[in-house]
Amino acid sequence: MSIQVFCDFDGTITNNDNIMSIMEKFAPPEAEEVKNRILSQELSIQEGVSQLFQLIPTNLHDEIIQFLIETAEIRNGFHEFIQFVNENNISFYVISGGMDFFVYPLLQGLIPKEQIYCNETDFSNEYITVNWPHPCDRLCQNHCGLCKSSLIRKLSDTNDFHIVIGDSITDLQAAKQADKVFARDFLITKCEENHISYTPFETFHDVQTELKHLLEVKL
């Protein structure tokens, strides 16, 4: 049995949710209603996020990138946590509902690209189009967009010990099949609603301390 860590990006690795930051800065007012319909699960994540990015003109590409580089902050303890998982031969994957045009640049030098799974964007038309290279498999019908539970099934063995780290509704399906969940913000609410056991965290120092204890117990 090996330990596999599956970690969200927006609002988890970064302090802020970059998609929401983009919408607040660059989207028209109607984005707020779409966002609320996603959080209430009235819209699927795939449908809602597609609608949000269709509100953003592609000619803002460079401005958006510069904005995120200036404002996105990596959560405290993440660099040390990555060093810890590497030293302990723990498999680590970023499974993000975020977009390639900002996830890859913000993680450059920290995580190898082959360990990052995110959505793809097309800037060739007037408005941003989101492509979905990691859809739901036959065991999930939630129209997740990037399906985190499907990726967990694809990337790991059923005998592995699955750890999920996340913060929002987009991490719920993954949390349902995890052996251990580290949760913050809205994911805590959803875990409690669905009777999913979780460990709260605010920094990756918190996660590392708990994971170190877990390794000692399992060894």
From Swiss-Prot:
Catalyzed reactions per annotation: 2-hydroxy-5-methylsulfanyl-3-oxopent-1-enyl phosphate + H2O = 1,2-dihydroxy-5-(methylsulfanyl)pent-1-en-3-one + phosphate
Gene: mtnX
Enzyme class of the recorded protein, top EC level: hydrolase
Protein name: 2-hydroxy-3-keto-5-methylthiopentenyl-1-phosphate phosphatase
Record's function text: Dephosphorylates 2-hydroxy-3-keto-5-methylthiopentenyl-1-phosphate (HK-MTPenyl-1-P) yielding 1,2-dihydroxy-3-keto-5-methylthiopentene (DHK-MTPene).
Pathway linked to the protein: Amino-acid biosynthesis; L-methionine biosynthesis via salvage pathway; L-methionine from S-methyl-5-thio-alpha-D-ribose 1-phosphate: step 4/6
Family as reported in the entry's similarity comment: Belongs to the HAD-like hydrolase superfamily. MtnX family.
Entry superkingdom: Bacteria
HAMAP family reported for this sequence: Salvage_MtnX (MF_01680)
Keywords linked to the UniProt accession: Amino-acid biosynthesis, Hydrolase, Methionine biosynthesis
Listed EC numbers: 3.1.3.87
GO molecular function list: 2-hydroxy-3-keto-5-methylthiopentenyl-1-phosphate phosphatase activity
Entry-linked NCBIfam families: DKMTPPase-SF, HAD-SF-IB, PRK09552.1, salvage_mtnX
Pfam families: HAD (PF12710)
Record-linked InterPro entries: HAD-like_hydrolase_phosphatase, HAD-like_sf, HAD-SF_hydro_IB_MtnX, HAD_hydro_PyrdxlP_Pase-like, HAD_sf
GO terms for biological process, alphabetical: L-methionine salvage from methylthioadenosine
Iron-sulfur found in the keyword field: no
Keyword Amino-acid biosynthesis: yes
